[in-house]
Amino acid sequence: GESAEMVTPHVLDWLERNGEEDNWMLHVHYWDPHTPYRTPADYESHFQGTPLPDDWITDDIFREHLLHIGPHCANEINMWNDDTFPQWPKHPGRLEDREAAKHLIDLYDDGVRYTDDNIGMVLDYLKSHGLYDENLAVIITADHGEDLGEFGVYGEHGMADEPVCRIPMIIRWPGVEGGKRVTGFHDNVDLLPTVQELLGTQTFGNYRY
């Protein structure tokens, strides 16, 4: 996946060329909250100086994590090794201590914030060009969350635990009052048939995932 600073200009260019058309759809995929964490070198962290909760990754827990081997453990952040990447200098290859674990969590948080900044740029464009109207639907979601120390796993989504299964789902839909929050259990496999129903198009009972 490409970083947001490469994706967003293409998004804005596409909107400039197609935004005035009727019945368009644009799918935008941002990779920045995904490992390797790759916010630009000059992007200022918004989370430095915020300590880990005392009851989260304690010294005893982290010492145990250092004994683990395998994909995305503290000793092998990058799946099978502790390599680093010149193009992503912020991303570590291994975690030596709790401070390094905190740094990795900050990088993830920065990736989420950076993605949010870029989504904001797209929404600002829509609003400033008269495209954010009563007919526009916007869906912001993800395919997975991220483990950041749970079960000794860092920067990975290979387990069906709560941090991995908990994803954002923000929907702005024509004719639906905003500001509502639904707290019940939902599954993102329901998104496609739900959108089809809202659009009044044909739905099928044989979806395969």
Regions found by a protein language model. Give the residues of each.
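Catalytic domains that recognize anionic headgroups
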Residues: 1-209
